[in-house]
Amino acid sequence: MKKIVLLSLSVFAAFSLSAQQPRDWAQYGRYERQNAALAGEPVEVVFMGNSITDNWIGADPDFFARNGFVDRGISGQTTAEMLARFRRDVIDLNPKAVVILAGINDIAQNNGAIKLENVFGNIVSMCDLARYNGIKVVLCSLLPCDRFS
């Protein structure tokens, strides 16, 4: 009987511990190594955004390197996820400017329905954080769309 109880407790504990593994919801770790490599290096501009931004560097990586540009786009990200990682992927790099392209995945409801005023608030918060830290903001407009598939 003791063995059954101990075995049951062990199985229960294993399930409980595995259920508590943290999920990297905002993909904080995506650029961890690259950010560490930039410590102390001058950064002119950080590009913060979604898949569109994520793919810009692929067009001409040398252009980014030559000009002190850093790409911190992550495909599929919403403004809430970008805001969550804004300190790590923008402010901590101490750029002169940040280019923000955000909101399209909120409209596509990648994380479920969201009110437009919340999307706006997330974008305003990123802008406020940047300005507070002496970083100029370039805010891009959303691309036009009428449906998502």
Residue map of PLM features:
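Intrinsic structural disorder
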Residues: 1, 50, 146-148
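Bacterial Sec-dependent N-terminal signal peptides
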Residues: 1-20
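Serine-esterase "nucleophile elbow" of acetyl-processing enzymes
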Residues: 19-99
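Alpha-helical cap/lid subdomain in secreted, periplasmic
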Residues: 61-68, 81-149
